[in-house]
Amino acid sequence: MRKCCYARRVTVPDSLIDEAARRFALLSDPTRLRILALLLEREPMTVTELSDSLGIAAPNVSQHLARLSAGRLVGREKQGRSVRYRTIEPSLHSLCELMCSALVEQAERLSVHPSRARAG
């Protein structure tokens, strides 16, 4: 058991920390992040729609969707002859908003204080 990093009063079992690490690993790939961002914006979408929108080969999109699906971040639904994908993890939108906001704030700080970028 470990104390949660943002709310120190909450104890999180190691199994949940392991699951969080697996999910963050899924989010560490730029292509998967692009797929998730597009799904959050326009879901549900087919592999072909994702492939065309992202300029990525359909087999590559399918492989990434399979990983995201196995990680329970996206789900699939059959509509006639096609399969459409959507996000199923409710926290994804909040997590993406948090990260984007933090990156924008950091970029703004660095543009005001460019010497901080070099200090790195």
How would you label these PLM feature ranges?
Residues D52, Q63, S69-A70:
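Alpha-helical residues within the helix-turn-helix
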Residues D18-A57, Q79-S91:
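N-terminal helix-turn-helix DNA-binding core of bacterial DNA-binding proteins
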Residues R32, Q63-H64:
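Histidine-centered divalent metal-coordination motifs
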Residues M1-E19, E41, E89-G120:
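Amphipathic alpha-helical dimerization/coiled-coil segments
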Residues P44, R67, R72-L73:
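Short hinge/loop at the helix->beta-strand junction immediately C-terminal to the helix-turn-helix recognition helix
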